[in-house]
Amino acid sequence: VEIQWRKSSFSEQSGNCLELAVVGGDVLVRESDDPGVVIRTTPEKLRAFLAGARDGEFDDFA
């Protein structure tokens, strides 16, 4: 099964960006400049992470 990776249409072709794929109900996340490292999560956990990022929960990491 070939994985269909997607990235934002706002990303530049040469830019480093996140790519997402859906496989068997899970979400895969990787960086385009390091495609060998893949994070597997669930849609629910990804939504919770994105909401936390939007709400500033991780601002102290940057």
Segments from the language model and where they lie:
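Positively charged, low-complexity terminal tracts
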Residues: 1-62
